[in-house]
């Protein structure tokens, strides 16, 4: 049977949802008996947008700061075709982006 190395990178704005998908991937890997490394948390990217509170530009300069955090996880899986097929069937929530790189 052919074995592949898959690198799965997950990113999303809510860390609990990203961790839930990571746990599903870990469960599939343990059920099929393949080796897994991770999830490795990558640095959280913090995006801040300062916006003026006053719509007309008059008065004192008061600002609102809107923030969005992007959480990332990285998982390496030594998988066979059956495991990869099961990984493709995982329901991914709307707020999570997933990228799978496969090396043979």
Curated annotation (Swiss-Prot):
A Gene Ontology cellular component where this protein is annotated is: small ribosomal subunit
Q: Which PROSITE patterns match?
A: RIBOSOMAL_S10 (PS00361)
**What Pfam families does the record point to?**
Ribosomal_S10
Q: Give the InterPro entries listed for this entry.
A: Ribosomal_uS10, Ribosomal_uS10_CS, Ribosomal_uS10_dom, Ribosomal_uS10_dom_sf, Ribosomal_uS10_euk/arc
Q: Which GO terms describe its molecular function?
A: structural constituent of ribosome; tRNA binding
Among SMART domains, the record links this protein to: Ribosomal_S10
GO terms, biological process = translation
Q: Which UniProt keywords apply?
A: Ribonucleoprotein, Ribosomal protein
Against HAMAP family, the record matches this protein to: Ribosomal_uS10 (MF_00508)
| Family in the record | Belongs to the universal ribosomal protein uS10 family.
How would you summarize the oligomeric state and partners of this protein? Part of the 30S ribosomal subunit.
Function field = Involved in the binding of tRNA to the ribosomes.
Could you identify this protein by its name?
Small ribosomal subunit protein uS10
Species name: Thermoplasma acidophilum (strain ATCC 25905 / DSM 1728 / JCM 9062 / NBRC 15155 / AMRC-C165)
């Amino acid at each position: 049977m052919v074995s592949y190395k898959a690198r799965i990178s997950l990113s999303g704005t809510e860390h609990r949802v990203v961790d839930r998908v990571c746990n599903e991937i870990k469960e599939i890997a343990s059920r099929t008996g393949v080796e897994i490394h991770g999830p490795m948390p990558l640095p959280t990217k913090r995006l801040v947008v300062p916006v003026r509170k006053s719509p007309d530009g008059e008065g004192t300069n008061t600002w609102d700061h809107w923030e969005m955090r992007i959480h990332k996880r990285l998982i390496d899986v030594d998988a066979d075709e059956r495991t990869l097929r099961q990984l493709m069937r995982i329901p991914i929530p709307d707020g999570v982006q997933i990228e799978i790189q496969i090396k043979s």
